[in-house]
Amino acid sequence: MDIFRILSRGASLKKSKDITTDYAVPSRKQFVNEKQKEENLKSVVDKEVDFFHTKKHTSHKETEKKNDEGEDEIEDEVPPLTISSDDDARKLRKLNKSKVSGEDIPLPIGSFEDLIGRYKLDKKLLSNLIDAGFTEPTPIQDEAIPISLEGRDLIACAPTGSGKTLAFLIPLVQTILQSNPNVKNYGIRGLIISPTNELAVQIFQELNTMTKGKKMKIGILSKQLANKINNKIINSSKYDILVSTPLRLIDSIKNETISLSKVEQLVIDETDKLFDQGFVEQTDEILSNCTNTKLRKSMFSATIPSGVEEMAQSIMKDPIRVIIGHKEAASNTIEQKLVFTGNEEGKLLAIRQMIQQGEFKPPIIIFLQSITRAKALFHELLYDRLNVDVIHAERTPKQRDEVIKRFKSGDIWVLITTDVIARGVDFKGVNLVINYDVPQSAQAYVHRIGRTGRGGKAGKAVTFFTKEDDKAVKPIINVMKQSGCESGYSGWLEDMHKLSKNEKKDVKKHEIKRKQISTVPKIMKQKRKQREEMIDASKRRKQESQSNTE
């Protein structure tokens, strides 16, 4: 059997004869049994190299049991964990590194089956969870689901890729299923707000999976749906749950084509962004239109600064606060590294060195601070014959969706982007995140590198910095320390002075002015400029000559 052919199937990676770099496929060390018979090798390897799990794979449990002749003992199936006492809860929270504060805190759950006995979880909802491959809850789900099902307001902070979306979708769907008024076009009862269209689409896809087989109307307020609602082609009251970005929803509210008066469950995802400048007024307007006296609010994010938390607390009723790990720490599955490149030219050289040394293992996401710089790096890496594309705010939603789809399917190996996809968008198999430009805050850093190391899988994040980044890099070091990644930076960086509040604000508000991305020598640039000037001068002389002739 041709092993290389098998290894190259699952991810659909397009290869070129011109590419000589050794792009390593993902490691096989996680295989349960390397001695499986030849007929099982294909399916196992296909699953390994299917970076983003876009294909359905059957369980290998039975096959492993039959073929693992060297194993004398097979582990007994562990019964679902149930939490029935404060002592059980304390042990679980210690294990999960969960910090929970508030009055009358419900016990966490130890398994999804635990929800059946305690909250009569809808059987079809549980079946949909299992069919989607969700067999046991994550730490944030352990806490957030019972808190929400008890009808309590919630502020939740957990690392990127830790399952926050399911943590609010499961109780949202369950609550609405239980409170079905059996009235046609009753009105929107569940509302989910997210800062970006990409994240809204992803949430809607998860919601669609959870509600499969149930008589529940769900919608995402896309441009097309908003137009139909605003033109009264569709009645918005038909929807039980609506997912939307703030501005589009506000536009429909002002047109009086969407009413939020029946909303019982409000979820604000990426709370730190939606309570930040530029979004906070929109968020406040949405909240003012949610007039139901029984309204329950949930707020989720990977980072929640103190100022944002204070604002959130002020609009909530007796909330419970859940922190998994540290408030501004990255997932412990991400290996973080700071690389000093000296100057801007050194960044491109650093990428090319990573390629030569075999550290450039796709899929990869590269973040830059501006659209102009993202475009420039895209063209530079195209010259290196890399399988690369770029996504930014100037591209249409349709173009961005297509690029994301191609990246997930493996047609694109390297995705260059701005912060437009830094939040929430789930790429399950990203091996490496490169911060070509240092992010302007600890929150932005955590969200960027959170595109890797998701769902408990290992990932790596590399951040390039120059002499101009002396202030911007300090918050990054603090996140790395909280995440246990002290080995990822040089010791002399510890001696940098602590930033004042004003310095932090200044770094966050003002982008560092950087040189143009290019490795073209200075003398070549001068020659190009001289040539362009000569061409322009020739054109002017020709135009003047034509004018004189006339």
Swiss-Prot record:
* Binding, ATP: 158-165
Task: Please give the biological process terms from Gene Ontology that the record holds.
Answer: endonucleolytic cleavage in 5'-ETS of tricistronic rRNA transcript (SSU-rRNA, 5.8S rRNA, LSU-rRNA); endonucleolytic cleavage in ITS1 to separate SSU-rRNA from 5.8S rRNA and LSU-rRNA from tricistronic rRNA transcript (SSU-rRNA, 5.8S rRNA, LSU-rRNA); endonucleolytic cleavage to generate mature 5'-end of SSU-rRNA from (SSU-rRNA, 5.8S rRNA, LSU-rRNA); snoRNA localization
Q: Where is this region: Disordered?
A: 53-83, 503-550
Q: Cellular location of this protein? A: Nucleus, Nucleolus
User: Which InterPro entries does the record associate with it?
Assistant: DDX52/Rok1_DEADc (IPR044764), DEAD/DEAH_box_helicase_dom (IPR011545), DEAD_box_RNA_helicase (IPR050079), Helicase_ATP-bd (IPR014001), Helicase_C-like (IPR001650), P-loop_NTPase (IPR027417), RNA_helicase_DEAD_Q_motif (IPR014014)
EC numbers: 3.6.4.13
Task: Say yes or no: keyword Hydrolase present.
Answer: yes
Q: Name one Pfam family in it.
A: DEAD
This protein's source sits in the domain of life called: Eukaryota
The similarity comment for this entry is: Belongs to the DEAD box helicase family. DDX52/ROK1 subfamily.
Assembly information from the UniProt record: Interacts with the U3 snoRNA and is associated with the 90S and 40S pre-ribosomes.
Could you tell me what this protein is called? ATP-dependent RNA helicase ROK1
Organism (species): Debaryomyces hansenii (strain ATCC 36239 / CBS 767 / BCRC 21394 / JCM 1990 / NBRC 0083 / IGC 2968)
User: The organism's lineage?
Assistant: Eukaryota, Fungi, Dikarya, Ascomycota, Saccharomycotina
The protein's gene is named ROK1
